[in-house]
Swiss-Prot record:
Binding site for Ca(2+): 1301, 1303-1304, 1306, 1309
Pathological condition linked to this protein in its record: Spondyloepiphyseal dysplasia congenital type: Disorder characterized by disproportionate short stature and pleiotropic involvement of the skeletal and ocular systems. Spondyloepiphyseal dysplasia, Stanescu type: An autosomal dominant spondyloepiphyseal dysplasia characterized by glycoproteins accumulation in chondrocytes. Clinical features include progressive joint contractures, premature degenerative joint disease particularly in the knee, hip and finger joints, and osseous distention of the metaphyseal ends of the phalanges causing swolling of interphalangeal joints of the hands.
Metal-binding in keyword set: yes
PANTHER family, per database record: COLLAGEN ALPHA, COLLAGEN TRIPLE HELIX REPEAT
Site (Cleavage): 181-182, 1241-1242
Keywords associated with the record: Calcium, Cataract, Collagen, Deafness, Disease variant, Disulfide bond, Dwarfism, Extracellular matrix, Glycoprotein, Hydroxylation, Metal-binding, Repeat, Secreted, Signal, Stickler syndrome
General function of this protein: Type II collagen is specific for cartilaginous tissues. It is essential for the normal embryonic development of the skeleton, for linear growth and for the ability of cartilage to resist compressive forces.
Disulfide bonds listed in the record: 1283-1315, 1323-1485, 1393-1438
Compositionally biased residues, Low complexity: 218-239, 310-320, 335-350, 370-382, 391-431, 622-631, 656-667, 833-848, 877-913, 1148-1157
Organism: Homo sapiens
Protein name, as recorded: Collagen alpha-1(II) chain
Outcome after substituting residue 1390 to N: In PLSD-T; phenotype previously considered as achondrogenesis-hypochondrogenesis type 2
Length: 1487
């Protein structure tokens, strides 16, 4: 074990401090450091400002304490070393290098072998030596004192063997066979004694069976056994002689009912019976045919905008839109790149003749001939040179159409078209087949108890039953004859007090006592049997029509009506949330095989199927080839420490180390096992007579001696103190009956008697009114599964399903070729069940069945009338001895027992209470005066002191200023119930009720003769008050009483700081479209656009009109006249001319129609604050509020100075043996001190107390920190989790503001709340706490609806909670944790109104204009409806429009903490110019 000196201990403790403390979020250097005498110390530093004073820095506070020195005894000249406080005794050891340390407790004997130390002083007397040789026989001793009483004698001769006893319990496990292996461990010399370590060996084999033991002693006399079970019946005896005739028997039972007579004729129809109980619901019918489609319903209201859907697949291309208006001419574009060469045109007509060619060489001179006759045409000459290209010809006629081109690539899908209007209703389809059998309906409500059945005919006799269970013990047998007298027994111990003796005869009649207080009312007697029905009264005059009543409770479900005709289709409802999928019904029975249907049309390709289940794992493959060696990976992170390895082999012996510092005193070790007894020593020489010893401790109590003879009668002693009451004695026998007592004085007035027993049932009462419908019973457990019922009639046609949304278009399939007809298919699965056939004709009546089994026992009959009281019976025998009396008072303490065996060392106990302060030490020397410390934080308020004597009355002071009126107090507890009032007069007639459900149609009555109309009778007199009706349900909590007298005017409050700008509200509704603005001026011409990218080549345009003839070319040199050519063909078309300049702008177009209103813009900034209104009149003073919250508890005071040193610790465990081999060669020394000197002297050295003072201070600081975690204070530095935790830790604290941190962790996000210490509630303040009173909403709409303040009203806001200094999301997180830690929440809201109704509308008498409030989980909480979502009004001062301010206080309580706090409020009765409101938001409280 490592022994630590004080410095190491401090380091460890400092680390421990750091680990225990939670994050306080403070900079160590700044917040936790301390300054003393101009010197800065870090948190947890320990220093000595002077030798006898020690200080520690504890989170910014300096704690100092004086060092207390112990006396240095047996020292002639103690010295105080430099810088130390306590004196030590110097030694004369000049050669030692240092002062010797303090001596430890005496160690156990070490293990020193064969080392001769220096000669020591003579030792103390050694232990007794080994046993010597036997000594001579001594003289005869004196007669001893009489010995203790001998044991009982040997038992008598054994009796006859008893019957074998029951098998005994299993014996303890035997020792194993190899006992030698269990003797492990030997002696542990360090502990100072031998320890026998018994280790369990393996179980040995079973030994041979032992011989039978000796016969046991005869058992005691057994108790009388229970009477045996009755024996089997004996064999029947012979027939006896015929007896005399008996007396006539009792009249026999009624015979069985005769067979029913023939049916009588049908009587006239009786009056309509009372409405029967509803029948049990029928089984669900078979699904009916599909109904005809209903008419289109009216268009439903627009649904709330849905969540944005996923992007749809692209729709098909839309049809081309209409042609737009002609645009303005654009700027002239840049010259485009040259187009591709056009197709070759048709040949043009030949152009005009070209200019004459050059002059040819002169021909030979011809002969001038006369003109000859015209010759024939010569052969065609050679082709002349090609002329220039002529102008372009006219376009040719269009060619015939070319072959069809290849299909283009599919275009991209167009945008989805608008949803088509609903189509006309389709032709009604053929009726569908009945659907499969539906799943069984839910278990119907249990029907009412049916009427009692008629008594069944007696059943056949049953078989003989099995043997019944053993009967209970029979009555005790008759008293046996008295046995012989036994020997006289010893006198028994005193019996318990006897039971009460029989009652003595009554005493004389006492004088009457004073009148007692009236007893409490007795319990109501049981309700009498119902009286017989009285005769019908005369019909009263017809009353006036009453006002419509409140809606009645829903009646019981009526009998099933006839199937109605299908109703008109209702308007399309909003899409409900999708329900949870129902459980699969049981498959119906297979129907008969239907005829084979026609082959269906080929369906659209189905949606992609769900992924299949994963396939079974394949068989294990062959192992793959080994892969290539991978690259070396990055170095891994350092792994966690591995488990400790096995112990290595022992190393070589190290050198002797230097002696370490002495350790702290250890705890005492467990006591060692007792050593073996030593052998008896030799008889020693008789010593001299010793001096008389001190009186020894009191010995253990000896065995009692034999009884001495009685002593002489002593003197009368003084009266002893009363002893402690003894234990209960055994019960004594009953005493004889006492004589009758004398007449007593009249008794005191008695206490009110207990509530009397229930009275005898009264006479049969009148039939009671029909009771109110009871609350809905808890659902019964599911019944067992019933048998399958018969198929019910078809149900009514279901309503039309909603039209499904258009599915995405599937990919177009290619048209398949018509397939060849297939082979005949296999028989199809059985078709659905056919329609139910018509019922068959009635069958013949069956043969009479066998006699049925005995019916169940009928219900118990109504109890008969009570018989007359019987005469008193004779006095019964003396009762059984009563139960044992109550436990007596505690007896005197018994004699001291023998000391028990030493227990195991227990675990260390928890810290004890601090001991009483020690005596004050001697005052130290006065130190220099320290600098004035910083003022400490204020301490906690002290406990109130004892009340001092009353001072003289002071003079009358001046009257103080009026205090501000407090906040409104919570409603007081409910008062005690008042006395029962007189039965009231009948109430006013209720409002007219809503019509009930239609009853079943009765049979038509006969036509009555019209009666003459009677005169209206006079109203009857008011009847006597009726009997008290049954107790109604408790009413709603009454509204609070009227305001108390007004309090004194409070002083005017200081004007509050300007609030921060509220959060941006939701955008307002769009305004009406504005009038169109004037046309703007023509804009400047824009910069020239860049050249566009080259477009794709367009199709050839139509042929243009013929171009204008080009200008005349320059005149050529005159040629010689050529031969006239033929007329040339038309030339090519000229090039297009340049684009002209842009024309002037056209006139302005007509004004366009006004466009649709754009979306509303973002909310504008809040307008400037308007001028202040006139000061309002002073309000009525509010009621006096509850006491204000408790102030913040002070910060923790500084830790006190360290306490006085504790008592010395227990001695440490035995030290290890010292290896003395280092001293082996010393031998006897001539010079110098004995090296073992310090190992010998047995006086304990004085401890060095100052080393422990530093540790004490650190531990005290640590203890404070841990204590603050275990018991939080509710301060900002040490917040609690909830106020309930604070109340548990500090039940005496008062209600007030405290800090809590529900999410724990760092305390920087703690929040300030109000703790109600009476209830443990945690109340979080709203921020801000009110909505100013003003006109918040103006609306000209006649239609009133609820307007949410935070969501709809301009400038409104959702209510938020928590501190100003907390971010809103931090407060929300804390509230979430607070809700999780709580089981109930409540909150009040005060609505200030001016001409606005908050709860009850007094004029209309209903709650339709009541406020709505919104919980934090967005649930709406109303004034009426489901009780889980309704609030209550504690005070309602806003029931009508008075033109003055009033207020209504509403409260909502729920165990669903997620609904609180309230985050928004919606009034309905607002919007007018005179209607104003404001809200005070109360704190939300969780418990």
């Amino acid at each position: 074990m490592i022994r630590l000196g004080a410095p190491q201990t401090l380091v460890l403790l400092t680390l421990l401090v750091a680990a225990v403390l939670r994050c306080q979020g403070q900079d160590v250097q700044e917040a936790g450091s301390c300054v003393q005498d101009g010197q800065r110390y870090n948190d947890k530093d320990v220093w000595k400002p002077e030798p006898c004073r020690i200080c520690v820095c504890d989170t910014g506070t300096v704690l100092c304490d004086d060092i207390i020195c112990e006396d240095v005894k047996d020292c002639l000249s103690p010295e105080i070393p430099f810088g130390e406080c306590c004196p030590i005794c110097p030694t004369d050891l000049a050669t030692a290098s240092g002062q010797p340390g303090p001596k430890g407790q005496k160690g156990e004997p070490g293990d020193i072998k064969d080392i001769v130390g220096p000669k020591g002083p003579p030792g103390p007397q050694g232990p007794a030596g080994e046993q010597g040789p036997r000594g001579d026989r001594g003289d005869k001793g004196e007669k001893g004192a009489p010995g203790p009483r001998g044991r009982d004698g040997e038992p008598g001769t054994p009796g006859n063997p008893g019957p074998p006893g029951p098998p005994g319990p299993p014996g303890p496990p035997g020792l194993g066979g190899n006992f030698a292996a269990q003797m492990a461990g030997g002696f542990d010399e360090k502990a100072g004694g031998a320890q026998l370590g018994v280790m369990q060996g393996p179980m040995g084999p079973m030994g041979p069976r032992g011989p039978p033991g000796p016969a046991g002693a005869p058992g005691p006399q057994g108790f009388q056994g229970n009477p045996g079970e009755p024996g089997e019946p004996g064999v029947s005896g012979p027939m006896g002689p015929r007896g005399p005739p008996g007396p006539p028997g009792k009249p026999g039972d009624d015979g069985e009912a005769g067979k029913p007579g023939k049916a009588g004729e049908r009587g006239p129809p009786g009056p309509q019976g009372a409405r029967g109980f509803p029948g049990t619901p029928g089984l669900p019918g078979v699904k009916g045919h599909r109904g005809y489609p209903g008419l289109d319903g009216a268009k439903g209201e627009a649904g709330a905008p849905g969540v944005k859907g996923e992007s749809g697949s692209p729709g098909e291309n839309g049809s081309p839109g209409p042609m737009g208006p002609r645009g303005l001419p654009g700027e002239r574009g840049r010259t485009g790149p040259a187009g591709a060469a056009g197709a070759r045109g048709n040949d043009g007509q030949p152009g005009p003749a070209g200019p004459p060619g050059p002059v040819g060489p002169a021909g030979g001179p011809g002969f001038p001939g006369a003109p000859g006759a015209k010759g024939e045409a010569g052969p065609t000459g050679a082709r002349g040179p090609e002329g220039a290209q002529g102008p372009r010809g006219e376009p040719g006629t269009p060619g015939s159409p070319g072959p069809a081109g290849a299909s283009g690539n599919p275009g991209t899908d167009g945008i989805p078209g608008a949803k088509g209007s609903a189509g006309a209703p389709g032709i009604a389809g053929a009726p569908g087949f009945p659907g499969p059998r539906g799943p069984p309906g839910p278990q119907g409500a249990t029907g009412p108890l049916g009427p009692k059945g008629q008594t069944g005919e007696p059943g056949i006799a049953g078989f003989k039953g099995e043997q019944g269970p053993k009967g209970e013990p029979g009555p005790a047998g008759p008293q046996g004859a008295p046995g012989p007298a036994g020997e006289e027994g010893k006198r028994g111990a005193r019996g318990e007090p006897g039971g009460v003796g029989p009652i003595g005869p009554p005493g004389e009649r006492g004088a009457p006592g004073n009148r007692g207080f009236p007893g409490q009312d007795g319990l109501a007697g049981p309700k009498g049997a119902p009286g017989e029905r009285g005769p019908s009264g005369l019909a009263g005059p017809k009353g006036a029509n009453g006002d419509p009543g409140r809606p009645g409770e829903p009646g019981l479900p009526g009998a099933r009506g006839l199937t109605g005709r299908p109703g008109d289709a209702g308007p399309q409802g909003k899409v409900g949330p999708s329900g949870a999928p129902g459980e699969d019904g049981r498959p119906g029975p297979p129907g008969p095989q239907g005829a084979r249907g026609q082959p269906g049309v080929m369906g659209f390709p189905g949606p992609k199927g769900a992924n299949g289940e994963p396939g079974k794992a394949g068989e294990k493959g062959l192992p793959g080839a080994p892969g290539l060696r991978g690259l070396p990976g990055k170095d891994g992170e350092t792994g966690a420490a591995g488990p400790p390895g096995p112990a290595g082999p022992a190393g070589e012996r190290g050198e002797q180390g230097a002696p370490g510092p002495s350790g702290f005193q250890g705890l005492p070790g467990p006591p060692g096992p007792p050593g073996e007894g030593g052998k008896p020593g030799d008889q020693g020489v008789p010593g001299e007579a010793g001096a008389p010893g001190l009186v020894g401790p009191r010995g253990e109590r000896g065995f009692p001696g034999e009884r001495g003879s009685p002593g002489a009668q002593g003197l009368q002693g003084p009266r002893g103190l009363p002893g402690t009451p003894g234990t209960d004695g055994p019960k004594g026998a009953s005493g004889p009956a006492g004589p009758p007592g004398a007449q007593g004085p009249p008794g005191l007035q008695g206490m009110p008697g207990e509530r009397g027993a229930a009275g005898i049932a009264g006479p049969k009462g009148d039939r009671g009114d029909v009771g109110e419908k009871g609350p809905e019973g808890a659902p019964g457990k599911d019944g067992g599964r019933g048998l399958t019922g018969p198929i019910g009639p078809p149900g009514p046609a279901g309503a039309n399903g909603e039209k499904g949304e258009v599915g995405p278009p599937g990919p177009a399939g290619s048209a398949g070729a018509r397939g060849a007809p297939g082979e005949r298919g296999e028989t199809g699965p059985p078709g659905p069940a056919g329609f139910a056939g018509p019922p068959g004709a009635d069958g013949q009546p069956g043969a009479k069945g066998e006699q049925g089994e005995a019916g169940q026992k009928g219900d118990a009959g109504a109890p008969g009338p009570q018989g007359p009281s019987g005469a008193p019976g004779p006095q019964g025998p003396t009762g059984v001895t009563g139960p044992k009396g109550a436990r007596g008072a505690q007896g005197p303490p018994g004699a001291t027992g023998f000391p028990g065996a030493a227990g195991r060392v227990g675990p260390p106990g928890s810290n004890g209470n601090p001991g009483p302060p020690g005596p004050p030490g001697p005052s130290g020397k006065d130190g220099p005066k320290g600098a004035r410390g910083d003022s400490g934080p204020p301490g906690r308020a002290g406990e109130p002191g004892l009340q001092g004597p009353a001072g003289p009355p002071g003079e009358k002071g001046e009257p103080g200023d009026d205090g501000p009126s407090g906040a409104e107090g919570p409603p007081g507890p409910q008062g005690l119930a008042g006395q029962r009032g007189i039965v009231g007069l009948p109430g006013q007639r209720g409002e007219r009720g809503f019509p009930g459900l239609p009853g079943p149609s009765g049979e038509p009555g006969k036509q009555g003769a019209p009666g003459a109309s009677g005169d209206r009778g006079p109203p009857g007199p008011v009847g006597p008050p009726g009997l008290t009706g049954p107790a109604g349900e408790p009413g709603r909590e009454g509204s609070p009483g009227a305001d108390g007298p007004p309090g004194r005017d409070g002083a005017a409050g200081v004007k509050g700081d300007r609030g921060e700008t509220g959060a941006v509200g939701a955008p307002g509704a769009p305004g009406p479209p504005g009038s169109p603005g004037p046309a703007g001026p023509t804009g400047k011409q824009g910069d020239r656009g860049e050249a566009g990218a080259q477009g794709p080549m367009g199709p050839s345009g139509p042929a243009g009109a013929r171009g204008i003839q080009g200008p005349q070319g320059p005149r050529g040199d005159k040629g010689e006249a050529g031969e006239p050519g033929e007329r040339g063909l038309k030339g090519h078309r000229g090039f297009t001319g340049l684009q002209g300049l842009p024309g002037p702008p056209g006139p302005s177009g007509d004004q366009g129609a006004s466009g649709p209103a754009g979306p509303s813009g973002p909310r504008g900034p809040p307008g400037p604050v308007g001028p202040s209104g006139k000061d309002g009149a002073n309000g009525i003073p509010g009621p006096i509020g509850p006491p204000g919250p408790r102030g913040r508890s002070g910060e923790t005071g500084p830790a006190g100075p360290p306490g006085n040193p504790g008592p010395p610790g227990p001695p440490g465990p035995p030290g290890p043996g010292i290896d003395m081999s280092a001293f082996a060669g010393l031998g006897p020394r001539e010079k110098g001190p004995d090296p073992l000197q310090y190992m010998r002297a047995d006086q304990a050295a004085g401890g060095l107390r100052q080393h422990d003072a530093e540790v004490d201070a650190t531990l005290k600081s640590l203890n404070n920190q841990i204590e603050s975690i275990r018991s939080p204070e509710g301060s900002r530095k040490n917040p609690a989790r909830t106020c309930r935790d604070l109340k548990l830790c500090h039940p005496e604290w008062k209600s007030g503001d405290y800090w809590i941190d529900p999410n724990q962790g760092c305390t920087l996000d703690a929040m300030k709340v109000f703790c109600n210490m009476e209830t443990g509630e945690t109340c979080v303040y709203p921020n801000p706490a009110n909505v100013p009173k003003k006109n918040w909403w103006s609306s000209k709409s006649k239609e009133k609806k609820h307007i949410w303040f935070g969501e709809t009203i301009n400038g409104g806001f959702h209510f938020s909670y928590g501190d100003d200094n907390l971010a809103p999301n931090t407060a929300n997180v804390q509230m979430t944790f607070l809700r999780l830690l709580s089981t109930e929440g409540s909150q009040n809201i005060t609505y200030h109104c001016k001409n606005s109704i908050a709860y009850l509308d007094e004029a209309a008498g209903n709650l339709k204009k009541a406020l709505l409030i919104q919980g934090s989980n967005d649930v709406e909480i109303r004034a009426e409806g489901n009780s889980r979502f309704t609030y209550t009004a504690l005070k309602d001062g806003c029931t009508k429009h008075t033109g003055k301010w009033g207020k209504t206080v509403i409260e909502y309580r729920s165990q669903k903490t997620s609904r609180l706090p309230i985050i928004d409020i919606a009034p309905m009765d607002i919007g007018g110019p005179e209607q104003e409101f404001g809200v005070d938001i109360g704190p939300v409280c969780f418990l």
